[in-house]
UniProtKB/Swiss-Prot annotation:
UniProt-listed GO biological process terms: tRNA splicing, via endonucleolytic cleavage and ligation
UniProt function note: Component of the tRNA-splicing ligase complex required to facilitate the enzymatic turnover of catalytic subunit RtcB.
Membership in a protein family: Belongs to the archease family.
Keyword annotations of the record: Calcium, Metal-binding, tRNA processing
InterPro entries: Archease (IPR002804), Archease_dom (IPR023572), Archease_dom_sf (IPR036820)
Name this polypeptide is given: Protein archease-like
Keyword tRNA processing: yes
Organism: Dictyostelium discoideum (Social amoeba)
């Protein structure tokens, strides 16, 4: 199975927030920061260090649309959360392969395995993505994203 040079979790931090949990990710550009956001969401539910991409690994293509950047970010996270919640696939690698800023659409490939509680260290369940305090900041050399999720 080809890996398509899928990105791996590296740029993130958990920030305390009174309501739930806020994720902060960053990257050299918005695409990398978005990939990191999907990965940190998965990492919060299952420690990605405990996930091995073996012969059982599967790749899924996720396509989402929005009406602005915030709704696009929401849709991306919500779709990956839906796959985890319904198919129990934990994604260890994510790569955005198409990012249309004018039409607010993203196509991403996620590579992961089915959750196995005997092998994987589980974290906290995420119930929903929220728009609360959602922030996307783009600068020439770095992009940052903040998202609060309901746990």
């Amino acid at each position: 199975m080809e890996s398509y040079g899928l990105g791996q979790l590296k740029n993130f931090e958990y920030l305390d927030h009174t309501a739930d949990i806020m994720f902060h990710t960053w990257g050299k550009d918005l695409k990398e920061a978005l990939e990191q956001m999907v990965l940190i969401m998965n990492n919060y539910m299952v420690e990605l260090d405990s996930v091995e991409l073996d012969d059982s690994a599967t790749e899924q293509t996720i396509s989402v649309n929005g009406h602005d950047m915030d709704s696009l970010l929401f849709a991306l996270l919500d779709e990956f959360l839906f796959v985890f919640s319904t198919e129990f696939i934990i994604f260890k690698q994510v790569q955005i392969i198409s990012f249309d800023r004018e039409n607010f659409s993203i196509k991403a490939i996620g590579k992961g395995v089915e959750l196995d509680k005997s092998k994987h260290t589980t974290g906290t369940e995420i119930k929903a993505i929220t728009y609360s305090c959602m922030k996307i900041e783009e600068n020439p050399d770095k992009s940052d994203i903040h998202v609060i999720v309901d746990i």
